[in-house]
Each structure stands twice: as structure tokens, then as C-alpha cells.
Amino acid sequence: MALTATAERTNIDLHSDMIKKAENLIPVLKERSESANVDRRIPKETIQDMKDAGFFKILQPKQYGGFELDPHTFSEVQLRISQGCMSTAWVLGVIGIHPFQLALYDDKAQKEVWGEDDNTLVSSSYAPMGQVTPVDGGFKFSGHWQWSSGSEHCDWALLGGLIFPPEG
């Protein structure tokens, strides 16, 4: 019972810490919001600020360096970030949800992404713009995915594609 109470207290403290960090970033994000909108990309400094604050690790499993907090904490942080820059909040939402999704995958996939660097960010383009071909040991993706918010800051991507039935 004491162990559970301690874990819950730690999560409450982390939640509060994340909210404070997000609130502290609001003035900086307001200063950068015009350039983010004009350049149509979030400044590298902003991504680094969010990495340093741990925002991309809110939903990431603890075993891979994350905080493994609840989606409520993530959405509260995103809401605070939106007060400084809506575009930044959008990109945080897009990139920051992927640790939750990746945590649902087999551990082999998680090790592949976070095994060497638990700060690795993942983008996505779920629209099935590519073709998926089954090959020995997996699948081959080919195509052109036209957009993925925040992808220039990521090393991995979750992609959508179509598998066509074999001819014949």
C-alpha cells in the first residue's frame, strides 16, 4: 500500500512539474510563434526546449527513459503550450502521442526505436500514400508521403500504406 501511495505521489509531482514547465515556456513560445507560422515549421530551439522539459517523454514507457504518465497530463501540457503557440501545441500533440502508440507495439520495435537513444522522436503519416509489399521477414514500403507535421525533428516515422492482393 505504501509503495502504491508513493508511486501516485510521484506521478502527481511529475504532473505538476510538467504543467509548471509548460507555463514557463508560454512567453518564449509567444515570441517565436510568428516565425513558426511564417516559416511553417517549429524552430529547433522550441523542439529542444520541449525535449529538455521532458514533454515528449510524458507517455513514453519508463523502461525506455520515459515518465509513463497519463494522457490527462499530456493534454494539460499541450493546452498550456497552445497558449504560447498553437502550431507548437499541434506538433507536440502529433509527435508526443507516438510514444503511447509505440508502447503498444512488440518490445522488439520499442528497442529498435529507443534502444540506443531514449530521446528519439517519431513522426507519422498515416494516410496510405505508399504501397506495402510483403517480403521475407517483413514488408517493403515504397511511395511518397507528402506531409507529416514535425517530421524534420524526428528520426523515425510511422507510415500508412496499402497492401495489394497478389496478381494472378
What are these regions (language model features)?
Residues 158-159:
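Extended active-site and interfacial segments that coordinate phosphate-rich ligands
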Residues 13-15, 34, 117-120:
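Intrinsically disordered, low-complexity segments enriched in polar/charged residues with Gly/Pro
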Residues 18-21, 25, 42, 46, ...:
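General structural feature for long, well-ordered alpha-helical segments within catalytic domains
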Residues 1-20, 24:
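Basic/polar N-terminal segments that are highly enriched at the extreme N-terminus
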Residues 15-17, 76, 162:
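Short N-terminal signal/transit or membrane-insertion segments
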Residues 25-33:
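N-terminal capping segment at the start of a domain
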Residues 44-52, 56-155, 164-167:
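Glycine-rich flavin
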